């Protein structure tokens, strides 16, 4: 373990967070709000970051798999601990556990909130809250790789540790170039959404906040009814961009190269769109009698399916009041998530596809014991290492969900439905759940212990368990 490289990178990341805090600082100044919470946090981040990068300056700057996992895990914890300081100092969330929960929810792009009166919060705080979505969406380590010259091109392990999904690789031979391409696509899509929303007469501040939330598939809103008070045009724009940010970013690179044949042959993309279409059709038919308008039912179901499938978490209606069939479909969509290599959370469409292909192979093998089954995805044979990883991930995934659910069951004021949906929603980085944590509710009623457990659930889900597991494992730090 190259410990110096680990802490050196943490120092650089903390310094980068100081730079990120300049945006909410400027917003606070523009709206004539006190800048002190951000100035103090920037000072703390700079001192800590510079100290770490100077004390632990490494001779060998190569990052291997072990270092990659540890850097990613510790970086996200450090970002959240420092990022919660403005919430505490501003008085928006004076309780540390509330502030930590909100910050983790932001960086992990979950969107679960403990704020009860979001419309009364300072603009600077709201901007920081949503900007954490944008930073966490593509991954702050990917951002660091894109801008810091000292990070070597053998750092693909950071990409693999931080980018969601079972298969992550390079778009181009150099990892640094891959990171830059990803962020250029990310910035372009975000800016495009801002322009479209402003054209729909959404105020610039609102457009920025909601574009950050859409891009990171996070879902923090600045209105009590989330997106419900905005025009139909703005809701449609956000629906489209939620779906776009749930697509594998490799496909956008193929589009830039005009390789449309490979783009439209993507099995994961068609499966993703198929799930969206089927779920939308079923929910539209199910809620039609509530609104007595096919157009209204289609608009609401389209938005909510896109929001839950991509794990964004915005809402235009209280879907917890919908019939049980619609609520059940949305609950199941919480597990699926978007495509691998997107900013969405959840299991990922490709991983679900591989699971069903593995099940089909085993069933065939039971009928034909001598057969040799080959699992293919996107027309290519999937190697055994990837298949083993998928097979191992599912039982671990459900074991963590079961454990977190049992801990939440100790809460006296929450029922099984609320606790289960809170667990699934936080672990899959969605935000709203059902019952007492539904789209018009918040997580503020949970105890400090439960909020901390749910914060860890969000981190585990965003990093897909293994980086945090490895970072806290004693064997990772042993010299053997």
Residue spans for each PLM region:
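Membrane-proximal intracellular helices of multi-pass ion channels
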Residues: 1-480
